[in-house]
Curated annotation (Swiss-Prot):
Pfam families: AdoHcyase, AdoHcyase_NAD. Belongs to the adenosylhomocysteinase family. One of its GO terms (cellular component) is cytosol. This is Adenosylhomocysteinase. InterPro entries: Adenosylhomocyst_ase-like_sf (IPR042172), Adenosylhomocysteinase-like (IPR000043), Ado_hCys_hydrolase_NAD-bd (IPR015878), NAD(P)-bd_dom_sf (IPR036291), S-Ado-L-homoCys_hydrolase_CS (IPR020082). GO terms for molecular function: adenosylhomocysteinase activity. PROSITE patterns: ADOHCYASE_1, ADOHCYASE_2.
Amino acid sequence: MNTHPQTSPNTHYKIADISLTDWGRKEIDIAEHEMPGLMSIRRKYASKQPLKGVRVTGSLHMTIQTAVLIETLKDIGADVRWASCNIFSTQDHAAAAIATSGTPVFAWKGETLEEYWDCTLQALTFTLSDGTLTGPELIVDDGGDATLLIHKGYELENGSTWVDEPSDSLEEQVIKRLLKRIAIERPGYWTRVVNDWKGVSEETTTGVHRLYQIAATGRLLVPAINVNDSVTKSKFDNLYGCRESLADGLKRAMDVMLAGKLAVVCGYGDVGKGSAHSLRAYGARVIVTEIDPICALQAAMEGFEVTTVEDTLGQADIYVTTTGNKDVIRIEHMTAMKDQVIVCNIGHFDNEIQVDALNALAGVQKINIKPQVDKFILPNGNTLFLLAEGRLVNLGCATGHPSFVMSNSFANQTLAQIDLWQNKDVYEKNVYRLPKKLDEEVARLHLEKIGVKLTTLTANQAAYLGISVEGPFKPEHYRY
């Protein structure tokens, strides 16, 4: 962990090492050639400037691929500030390149929880020409932390007592302390932020789940676009991205031979599907756990054994959580696992695994092997390896998804930001999805790069199907 991040005199950035700029810029240049969707959007909208002067905060993994997203948003007019959405996911050379280009960025690999939430606050803090502190007009969120902080801050200013209630986790304690501090240092700040805030686009399953929960209670403060459930996000980033990046994270962390190992994948949604197929492709024997009978049946029809975590204890070599739920792997599971077991998460938050309970287990011995790899010697003498402290293994122990698949996701994010701003007076405070036509367009932008040639419908064929020759080609309810 970098305990002394570098800060510019005018708080323009807070990163690990500005000298990494050249390395970061070289990798950004490579990524641009692998991200045809984003680059096409950049060319299309650069002259139109649809986000001209719009204050945009990003809370999303500060990677090389995200750097291309940031520079696309800037090229179409946005005034951008950025933080990572995970304490381990920042690529420090990417952050350096973005800081050098003039974008305020607050992110480094190995932040503490206090540093992480302070970085989120700094990314949310814009200063008007008269010196007034305000917030963003749009947010690009990943996991919903920026959205959560604004909602909790606003609710505190309007009488909520949540900050004084018992906390479920250490991270919740950190959030509450931050909100109490801001209430003293910046009275009325969150109300000013909400007055200017026009919308949020959310990247992940976990963040979308949060949005729907808030909307169901009538407390959602702005319109939100669910980017995660765009087909060109969920069926590509979640599935094909995880199919490549999970194994990358495991191998960089442990140098482990996957062939012949028994691996348990908890969850068989899109992320679980990609993870299970990745491990099987490497020769691992894969067991899936599921709560949903449809997903369980899918896994079984793909040839995976489907059972419970409890039935695998003492046998499996690797456990991977992919669910977006909490307490999927509990302390009683970990103490019953076989010696030398590897436990990791590729869902979103670290609460999929009871990490706090593992750290607090009486008689446990914790040994750090290297960054994001911890060895726990349990009271029974068995050893358990926990990767990335239970946070995202593909970003904590490797570099996340490849550029090409992230171009799909980030093209959706950019289009969502444009849509939110153009329709800020139309959208109500609800959760929306991008229309099918835009989803298809995102896919179309990536075809030439991989040598795909589409068949074109004749007018008669289109009429027979009851669709336009140009699409959309599927109804909204179609399941890809």
